[in-house]
Amino acid sequence: MAEYKDTLNLPNTSFPMKASLSVREPEMLADWQAKGIYQKIRKARVGSKRFILHDGPPYANGHLHCGHALNKILKDIIIKSKTFSGFDAPFVPGWDCHGLPIELNVEKKVGKAGSKISPREFRAKCREYAASQIDIQRDEFQRLGVLGDWYNPYVTMDYHYEANIVRALGLMIKNGHLQQGFKPVHWCIDCGSALAEAEVDYEDKTSPSIDVAFSAVNPSEFLNCFGTQPAVKPLILPIWTTTPWTLPANEAVCLHPEIDYALIDAGNSYYIVATDLVESVMARYGISHYKTSGSAKGRVFEHFKLQHPFYKRQVPVVLAEHVTTESGTGCVHTAPAHGPDDYLVGQSYQLPLINPVMANGCFAENVELFAGISVLKANETILTVLSERNVLLASESIRHSYPHCWRHKSPMIFLATPQWFVSMDKSNLRQAIINEIDKVNWVPDWGKARISNMVENRPDWCISRQRSWGTPMPLFVHKTTRELHPDTLELIEKVAVMIEKSGIDAWFDLDSSELLGDDAKHYDKITDTMDVWLDSGISHYSVLKHNNDLDFPADVYFEGSDQHRGWFNSSLTTAVAMYGVAAYKTVLTHGYTVDAEGKKLSKSKGNYVALDKLVNQHGADILRLWVASTDYRHEVSISEEIIKRNADAYRRIRNTARFLLANLFDFNPASDCIDAKELLELDRWALKRCQLLQEEIITAYENYHFHLIYQKIHNFCAVDMGSFYLDLIKDRQYTTAKDSIARRSCQTAMYHMVKAFTIWLAPILSFTAEEIWQTIPGNNSESIFIEHWYDAWPTIDAVNMEDWEQLHIVRDEVNKALEETRQRGEIGSALAAEVTVYADAKALPKLTRLGEELRFLFITSEAKACPISQSPKGLAVTDCGVSIQVTASVHEKCARCWHRREDVGQNQEHPELCLRCVGNISGYHEERLYI
């Protein structure tokens, strides 16, 4: 055999089987950066239609995790696929830089602003810290193969951006959406600041569950409503609460106007509770003997007076729709300073809005009984006071969902404080937003209902914060009237210009008289900063509308599902408030990263998968394949086992590319491509299959169905290529003459296929695709990412794809029969066998048409097809309507092609060869038509 090895066209390539991604990827990344590949991509698409995917800014704090990788890789896949589709698709990454997490990290190092360090110095340290985090994250994002304008990102702490935040506030004021108010807001005691809805997490908490007696000041007026004769015993409206610390702020008891309330005679006292809750309430109070003495609607008790349980003041009965009979008593404790529903009721009844709690979470010194006590520790004291006054009707502990600070994980409180709000209803903003939601394409479609519900139910947006590191609210309010300065809009622009030059310190350092002159003595300068969700939310204004490479509105916003209450919401609200339209045309949402069992990733649970470890161990392309392989619309599972499965799939893809490249080692596209009319039918089938598959893949990219692309490519490698085409062409590729039509036909097809295949891969397996691209013979562009979807297909005659589908099916059945024969020990390899296929009228013509080439379909030494009527008795008929007979060949094996042929040894000069091989090494070009 040794003397004939050199006569074979054995594959050869510099493209390695072992990927060594952790070594090659950084080298390729450095090459992209050195060559300015991103800039060259943009240059190649100058004048093309733009596609804008606007990047939601991650927070500049800490190393990236798998959730970051999922998000940025998905975006990168979209950008690259759009570039291949001919769009000019710039990608400008962003970072969110103000806010509490950065403050907390800086505080650990230098202390709180205003104590060990001045606020100005503190802000400088925050800016310095955020910049260092951006550098870390920039490198980590680029390591994932994400292309973009990484050294010209948008950064919310840039002076230009900060100035535009201020200008955006001015636009919202101009349009009538800003209002100030003393309202209850989510308040984090640890932060010392108000928080927005998006900064609140709901977690389980154990709280006291108590029932408290509010006694009627005049029982007779209540009893008269039931038509009951007055009696000399107390009448109680019991309330139920899980926040006893709010009782000092109680100003009313609220009933539902249309709920039926029962008068319960319990012997020593009367109780009024919702009819539907009588049984559960009496059981809770341990009262087994009672009777119902009447029923009345809640509305009849309006304005009746009750005695506060431990203060001398009397409080009214008020009415509201938020009262339910799902739990409690149907009588709701109402403290306008400590809840949004309570506040609204208080406003409608003009109840006192008295806040007994200070910003540090402690009761003020003038609060009777509880002065100086933290509200987080006050419940026990309050229960003692209630017990001493015999008004505690029931008490137990319950586990329930309760708002917590997203950063500190500590329980929050509702606290009435002077704040600034974007009013959802003052200028009909809520309805305008809902109207815009209908115009947006939401993927998945449940996103529309989710954000609609949030907008419909959200309170006014509290945008003021009591923090140091944030964009200031550059407002002046009159010391007496508390009205904004009449020249507010002009003043805001002046401050914006100052911030653009010197940053936010320009406002904090400003003496009011510099802008107001003598008027300064009449106005207070606001020191609040703005909600960071407003910072990122106005990126449509500061970035899309101010960057000439971008457009407004964006084609796509794409973030995790938590951003329906975060960035999607703040972007939508601000855009509609500023110019009346949504900031985006389409919103895509991906799920969270979870472990293999669907549980949240956590270091404490031991299921956390470190991103840097994955990248260093497996390579970024394996991670990118993981992203593409999952349906991102649901939760996305990750584990070492899942990554290993993706690594296996990657090897199949890489080996497919390597096989194609290895068989093009002596192929020059400029001189060796043959005319389409000369292509063998199998090659024409393969090219047609690729063209059809490319259409499916492009459609899937356009629809953002990346998991379908993964499936299609994997199936193409495993089935169309691995188990069919590449298997069939080996004999022709290796044994026919180097320059024969048969071989060049195959190489021509493989050349077109590998170019198309590599571009399909490129949005997903970016590093590997570039590596393949640089190995493909011919004059290729500097980078694959400058290319379009492959369109240099040869024009081929119609191929009967159904015929080849049938041949593929029959081949699979033959392979099963060969394997069974091998298992019985009758043959070794398939080339040791001869096959007869007995086929029905549908399959027979397709098989006989191949003639002598039928054996190449089965990779056996001999093959023939006969009518099924000639099938020997007892030979099973397969599902595809054929019977298969396998026999061991009795002929000698050709030392070159390994086929067992009757003519082996007939040539005296080459006694070990079949005559076909003799011809191929003697300059005779073997003719093939089909395979």
Swiss-Prot record:
Biological-process GO terms, alphabetical: isoleucyl-tRNA aminoacylation
Keyword NADP attributed: no
Binding residues for Zn(2+): C894, C897, C914, C917
Any one of the GO CC terms: cytosol
GO molecular function: aminoacyl-tRNA deacylase activity; ATP binding; isoleucine-tRNA ligase activity; tRNA binding; zinc ion binding
Cofactor notes: Binds 1 zinc ion per subunit.
Residue numbers covered by motif 'KMSKS' region: 600-604
Enzyme class: ligase
Subcellular location: Cytoplasm
Pfam families (UniProt xref): Anticodon_1 (PF08264), tRNA-synt_1 (PF00133), zf-FPG_IleRS (PF06827)
Cofactor(s) recorded in Swiss-Prot or TrEMBL: Zn(2+)
Reaction catalyzed: tRNA(Ile) + L-isoleucine + ATP = L-isoleucyl-tRNA(Ile) + AMP + diphosphate
SUPFAM superfamilies attached to this UniProt entry: Anticodon-binding domain of a subclass of class I aminoacyl-tRNA synthetases, Nucleotidylyl transferase, ValRS/IleRS/LeuRS editing domain
Chain residues that bind ATP: K603
UniProt binding sites for L-isoleucyl-5'-AMP: E559
NCBIfam families: ileS (TIGR00392)
Record-stated family: Belongs to the class-I aminoacyl-tRNA synthetase family. IleS type 1 subfamily.
Name of this chain's protein: Isoleucine--tRNA ligase
